[in-house]
Curated annotation (Swiss-Prot):
PANTHER family: RNA M5U METHYLTRANSFERASE, TRNA (URACIL(54)-C(5))-METHYLTRANSFERASE. It comes from Bacillus cereus (strain ATCC 14579 / DSM 31 / CCUG 7414 / JCM 2152 / NBRC 15305 / NCIMB 9373 / NCTC 2599 / NRRL B-3711). It is an enzyme of class 2 (transferase). InterPro entries: MeTrfase_TrmA_AS, MeTrfase_TrmA_CS, NA-bd_OB-fold, SAM-dependent_MTases_sf, TRAM_dom, TRM5-TYW2-like_MTfase, U5_MeTrfase_fam. S-adenosyl-L-methionine binds at Q290, Y319, E340, D388. GO terms for biological process: rRNA base methylation. This is Uncharacterized RNA methyltransferase BC_0364. Residues 8-66 form the TRAM domain.
Length: 458
């Protein structure tokens, strides 16, 4: 007969603990008789008093009440709303400490999920200046005391924190959004009210080309009509000559989804342009484009290095998106085939290939695990396979396709170390050997870490 385990802690109890680790979302982990307790802002090695605030069968949540000892990596957060906004999770940890924590996270999942304890995991490639790196701001608009507020949602809520600036956001976007808020307020624009499904302006988005200096402004509205549109556009265009595109997206639905189906250019071009390395990209309101282009170049350079191309290879890029990695590879490969399930992304990929006069990149729409075997039957034999899947990792059918096709080399670009480790294990069981894993810090002060790994057929 089984006995029901009783958690060793109770709600509202005060206890002393030592934090052993960080979770994937940046909380400190302490254990009482092997029972884990998750505490926001706790750092490994610290001794602290905590208050138990929620007890579950297999874990509990606590609140940090008092530190008895401090980690040498602890620091005061630089953002004044750090503890309210959910955008960053690690500002209380020095940047050196963040990079070490991310490296440990990658090593741990390689061993625990992938069974790959012997695979070299290199130190994380970080930024010289880990601030003001984001080129896209997507800001909800609300009303308070008769005026407009623009900022970010309080962690775990839809309560908008009004922010004048964000320390990880390009200053150009911050400045523009604050002025747009003022101009809209002056012209009587009302904010969307989610509960009542009333009001006009839902979100404002700004996209900034870090190399070109061009900016796109997007109004996301509940109604097709934007009152005083002409005056608003004229004022913005006069004040910000770097704004090359103003776009309106209409979302009439009662939903948390930001974008609606209809997008209209109000001023200037449908696109702004930017460069990653020598490759030029056209960016529309809905385009996927990496938000940290400086570190994207680091990631893509490492991908190119791991692909070891000499100009004679055929490369397949699965989950190719707007063709950003494909075009990087096409600089060195004989031929690159990219596949992506989103038709609009492939339109962007073809546009970007033409923009760069690249004739050796070809793109197809569809599921990678369907399109790639079709190409194989048509005689497309990949020497190198590159995959850059979403957070859920590669589809099992695609991994089986790679194993069946037997390209000599596989380069795996990942935004989730856990699914990377899982998929590397499958590829190893199918005849590949993982050579090395390079983590890259694309999002300083958050818990996210990107990786690029390469495998060879053995």
């Amino acid at each position: 007969m089984s006995t029901k385990m009783t958690p060793p802690v109770e709600k509202n109890e005060f206890i002393d603990v030592v934090f052993e680790d960080l979770t994937h979302d940046g909380a400190g982990v302490a254990k009482v008789k092997g029972y884990p307790i998750f505490v926001k802002n706790g750092l490994p090695g610290e001794e602290a008093q905590i208050k138990i605030i929620k007890v579950k069968k297999n874990f509990a949540f606590g609140r940090l009440m008092k530190l008895h000892t401090e980690s040498p990596y602890r620091k005061d957060a630089e953002c004044p709303v750090y503890n309210q906004c959910g955008g960053c999770q690690l500002q209380h940890l020095t940047y050196e400490g963040q990079l070490q924590a991310k490296e440990k996270q990658v090593r741990d999942v390689m061993q625990r999920i992938g069974g790959l304890a012997d695979v070299p995991v290199h130190p994380v490639l970080g930024m010289k200046n880990p601030w003001v790196y984001r080129n896209k701001a997507q800001v909800p608009i609300g009303e308070r005391e008769g005026g407009l507020v623009a900022g970010f949602y309080r962690q775990g809520t839809h309560d908008i924190i009004n922010m004048e600036s964000c320390l990880i956001q390009a200053e150009e976007n911050d400045t523009l959004i604050q002025e747009v808020k003022r101009i809209c307020e002056k012209h009587g624009i009302t904010a969307y009210n989610e509960e009542r499904n009333k009001g006009t302006l839902r979100h404002v988005m700004a996209r900034y080309g870090q190399v070109t200096g061009e900016i796109m402004l997007v109004f996301i509205t509940r109604t097709a009509e934007l009152p005083n549109k002409k005056a608003i556009i004229e004022e913005i265009a006069a004040k910000f000559p770097e704004v090359k595109s103003i776009v309106q997206n209409v979302n009439t639905k009662r939903t948390n989804v930001i974008f609606g189906d209809k997008t209209t250019v109000l001023y200037g071009s449908e696109y702004i342009y930017d460069f990653i390395g020598d490759i030029k990209f056209a960016i529309s309101a809905r385009s996927f484009y990496q938000v940290n282009p400086e570190q994207t170049k680091v990631l893509y350079d490492k991908t190119l290095e791991y692909a070891k191309l000499n100009g004679n290879e055929t490369v397949i890029d699965a989950y190719c998106g707007i063709g950003s990695i494909s075009l990087f590879l096409a600089q060195k490969a004989k031929k690159v085939y990219g596949v992506e399930i989103v038709p609009e992304a492939i339109e962007d990929a073809n546009r970007n290939a033409a923009l760069n006069n690249m004739t050796n990149a070809e793109f197809g729409v569809g599921e990678a695990e369907v399109v790639i075997p079709k190409w194989y039957k048509e005689g497309v034999i990949a020497d190198t396979m590159v995959v850059d899947p979403p957070r859920k990792g590669c589809d099992e059918a695609l991994l089986n396709t790679i194993i069946d096709m037997k390209p000599n080399r596989v380069v795996y670009v990942s935004c989730n170390p856990a699914t990377l480790a899982r998929d590397l294990k499958v590829l190893e069981e199918g005849g590949y050997k993982t050579q090395e894993v390079q983590p890259v810090d694309m999002f300083p002060h958050t818990t996210h870490v990107e990786c690029v790994a390469w495998l060879k057929l053995v």
